[in-house]
Amino acid sequence: NPKEKSRLPKISKLDSNNPLKFDLYESNIEPYLRFTHKMNIKMASWVKVKNITQDNEMARCQHSYIAHYNNVSPQERQDICNLTVGSWDIEAFSHTSRYSNINEFPNPENPLDIITQIGTSLYKFGTKEKVKHVVTIKSPIDGECDPVDGVIVETYDSEKDLIEGWVKFIIKTDPEILVQYNGYGFDWKYVCARAKVLDIEYILENLSRIESKPAQLHEDQLNTSAYGDNTMQYLKMYGVTQIDLMFLIKKEHKLE
């Protein structure tokens, strides 16, 4: 704002021995919330954007544009766009449980407790398009996984290649929503820990849709009457909505 800029020289010349105090309002409001409120835009609703400029360097989306915020306006539409929704789950191997009589949960810091497979199901909302996909490790005894009807099976020689193959699949199919069950309590933490052991954390960074914001393991503490005390650990993928069904079930049903 030119008027605001014109005040800066005057402020810089104030006597530093007599500091002034200013009230700061709404400093904790995220810019996008302020934007949607100012433009009267409802969350997860349709908008119309005019005078756009295509930008292929800012994001990894199918379509990426730049526009002035004044050129974004709300649209009264009730239909839902064809979002791609993905559900995924991992299987991990406990070397101790497999080769001893001790029933021990897989430990991601143990080099032998590898991820053996990651399964993903995709569907496009409002259509009958569905994809079932699994990446798995080649067995030293049985070799590659047998074909599975209706499922795309990719077999890899190593856990490193398996994780990289899954990341490439997610980037290629580009789901807007990812659904897990206890993903915030186990899956993401395990995947990120294994990536660290294998020194391939950089591969997971590419799951963000925003070039300038790599995906990173994020931890949140949640304390509510509905959910109780919870620690959530997940890979923060900018531009992708993630849902953990376990938290929804805990909210709707009292588990004993």
Give names to the regions the model predicted.
Residues N1-E256:
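The two-metal-ion catalytic cores of nucleic-acid processing enzymes
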